[in-house]
């Protein structure tokens, strides 16, 4: 998730309140105590959670020398950069070499440019505005700025009941939508998209915040390209939710339910890539077709095409590494 900071120098309580309500990650202020009276949000100030000149740096890019200084500072912490006439080239140069650049912006249009420069975008933005409505607009821009995951259609090759085991329901703090899901796999090299419980069913009410994701051993894809075992997820963790067209956003875990249930193995293939996932054997568990519609594992047949993602390399504590790791 991209960082959303708001510059409140000079202090304005109405803007601070709007920023907090809009999900700002941090407020840049002259006195952190003013922020603490309003809520639990990171304050960037001399007496704050992050201290300017120590944890966070600010610099205006005016020439190649200041650009190089920004890169040097980025090795010590996050760097807020200002580009006088808001030219993109300095941002491109910085983003190409550092993932600790925060762009100073004045509106949602500038934020969108910063967050998409060189496709990867800056680490976040610092918004300076007098308009509460602009704060809300930028918050929406941030929410839609998640990286895209390359999704491919996999052809189902095998569906086999495997007996009883422990499966994991991931209950998020978000209402999830039709046509999106979490990416889960038996190995860290390939994942299937598991649909949330958004659809009507004669047996149980929809639970649009929930994804019945798979067995406890499975990997789930997280923001930033990391993975975690489903069994290791906990309240407050962030998981990656992907739309069937590729864009992603984060969701906060509100609860994890592990229960013993009958399980089903699904295997599929896309070119040379293979994917497998052990899921609960029940009609409410669904994968995602190419057009974004959901298909129940109870109705799934060999030859069906469902969406998934392929990753390269192995994993060490959830982080991608370049070494030979065989998972099967």
UniProtKB/Swiss-Prot annotation:
Listed NCBIfam families: PRK02290.1-5
Enzyme kind, highest EC tier: oxidoreductase
Leader sequence segment: none
Record's function text: Catalyzes the oxidative deamination and cyclization of 2-amino-3,7-dideoxy-D-threo-hept-6-ulosonic acid (ADH) to yield 3-dehydroquinate (DHQ), which is fed into the canonical shikimic pathway of aromatic amino acid biosynthesis.
EC number of this enzyme: 1.4.1.24
Catalyses which reaction(s): 2-amino-2,3,7-trideoxy-D-lyxo-hept-6-ulosonate + NAD(+) + H2O = 3-dehydroquinate + NH4(+) + NADH + H(+)
Lineage: Archaea, Methanobacteriati, Methanobacteriota, Stenosarchaea group, Methanomicrobia
Coiled-coil stretches noted in the UniProt entry, renumbered to this chain: none
UniProt keyword list: Amino-acid biosynthesis, Aromatic amino acid biosynthesis, NAD, Oxidoreductase
Name of the gene: aroB'
A GO MF term: 3-dehydroquinate synthase activity
Xref: InterPro entries: DHQ_synth
Similarity section: Belongs to the archaeal-type DHQ synthase family.
Name of the protein described by the UniProt record: 3-dehydroquinate synthase
GO biological process: amino acid biosynthetic process; aromatic amino acid family biosynthetic process
């Amino acid at each position: 998730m991209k960082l959303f900071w708001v510059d409140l120098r000079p202090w304005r309580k109405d803007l601070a309140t709007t920023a907090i309500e809009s999900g700002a990650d941090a407020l840049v202020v002259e006195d952190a105590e003013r922020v603490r009276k309003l809520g639990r949000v990171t304050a960037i100030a001399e007496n704050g959670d992050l201290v300017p000149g120590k944890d966070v740096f600010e610099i205006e890019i005016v020439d190649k020398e200041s650009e190089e200084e920004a890169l040097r500072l980025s090795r010590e912490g996050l760097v807020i950069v200002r580009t006088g006439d808001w030219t993109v080239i300095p941002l491109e140069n910085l983003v190409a070499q550092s993932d600790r650049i925060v762009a100073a912006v004045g509106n949602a249009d500038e934020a969108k440019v910063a967050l998409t420069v060189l496709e990867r975008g800056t680490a976040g933005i610092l918004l300076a505005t007098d308009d509460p409505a602009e704060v809300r607009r930028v918050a929406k821009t941030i929410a839609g700025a998640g990286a895209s995951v390359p999704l491919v259609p996999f052809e189902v090759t095998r569906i086999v009941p495997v007996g009883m085991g422990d499966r994991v329901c991931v209950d998020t703090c978000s209402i999830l939508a039709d046509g999106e899901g979490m990416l889960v796999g038996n190995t860290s090299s390939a994942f299937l998209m598991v649909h949330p419980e958004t659809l009507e069913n004669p047996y149980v009410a929809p639970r649009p915040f929930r994804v019945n994701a798979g067995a406890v051993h499975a990997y789930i894809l997280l923001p930033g390209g990391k993975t975690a075992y489903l069994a290791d997820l906990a309240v407050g963790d962030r998981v990656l939710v992907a739309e069937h067209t590729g864009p992603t956003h984060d969701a906060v875990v509100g609860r994890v339910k592990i229960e013993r249930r009958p399980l089903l193995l699904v295997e599929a293939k896309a070119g040379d890539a293979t994917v497998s996932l052990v899921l609960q054997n029940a009609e409410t568990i669904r994968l995602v077709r190419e057009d974004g519609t959901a298909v129940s594992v109870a109705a799934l047949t060999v030859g069906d095409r469902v969406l998934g993602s392929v990753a390269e390399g192995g994993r060490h504590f959830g982080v991608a590494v370049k070494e030979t790791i065989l998972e099967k």
